Design a protein with these regions (language model features):
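Two-component system phosphorelay core
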Residues: 1-51, 55-115
Length: 115
């Protein structure tokens, strides 16, 4: 099993800075990410893909989801140049990466609520 692509140092800093609001930040990230994934799957428009990928990239980067941010950057930068099949694969890769890292944030949320 591979280790999810999450920068734990970023989470440590966020936990320290956000203190009691950290669980809410995690909830917001998880909920917003689900909405962004839904939007990515629902659209075939390159401009909408780029906009959604840009937004998702920013939040993923802020939350330390390194590989997720890289995949979103790829989609944002290349949405107009890739074939529909390649775009669908990239969206699937983003979805898969989020599925891989989501448990890290769920665990963080659980840990924050118990301490």
């Amino acid at each position: 099993m591979t280790v999810p692509n999450v920068d734990r140092d970023v989470l440590d800093i966020l936990r320290e800075v956000m203190e009691g609001d950290y669980p809410e930040l995690l909830d917001t990230f998880l909920n917003d990410s689900e909405e962004r994934l839904s939007n990515l799957r629902a659209t075939k428009d390159a401009d909408q893909l780029m906009s959604c990928a840009h937004s998702f990239k920013g939040s993923a980067c802020n939350m330390g989801a390194v590989r997720l941010a890289e995949l979103c950057q790829d989609l944002e930068s290349n949405a107009k140049d890739k074939s529909p099949e390649a775009l669908a694969q990239l969206v699937a890769d983003i979805h898969s990466e989020f599925a891989d890292v989501r448990p890290v944030y769920e665990d963080e949320k659980h840990h924050a609520h118990t301490h």
